[in-house]
Amino acid sequence: MIDELMVQQQVKSVWQHMVGVMCLNLTYRKQVKKLLPKLFKRYPNATAYIRGRYKTQEKMLRPLGMSTVRAKRIRLMSMDFLSWNRKDARALYGIGKYGNDSYRIFYKNE
């Protein structure tokens, strides 16, 4: 059970939660669990991520695979996040039903 909630244990904000959800897509939890603290130390929020160097982000995400795609998706989601109304997480780039359900459970108490 603890491992199942590992994303929630490592995040301090909704943005970090969404990044965690995106990183878990097609990736083992163990890999994501190692990477998130490093990623969030360097990029604690959407603004920091957007201002960061794309090549550095791509390199950091490389251990998860598909780093080019992940870096781009997280960047686009982060841009959406800054103007998001926080109603439906599917409005964010790259966040689907799983991410929206997770948001509703952990942040909207639905």
Language model features: what each stretch is:
Residues 1-86:
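N-terminal polyanion-binding entry modules of DNA glycosylases/AP lyases
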Residues 9-10, 93, 107-108:
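Cytochrome P450
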Residues 101-110:
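Catalytic Zn2+-binding segment of zinc metalloproteases
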Residues 84-85, 99-102:
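Short, structured loop/turn "capping" segments at alpha-beta junctions
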Residues 87-93:
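Cytochrome P450 C-terminal beta-domain/meander region
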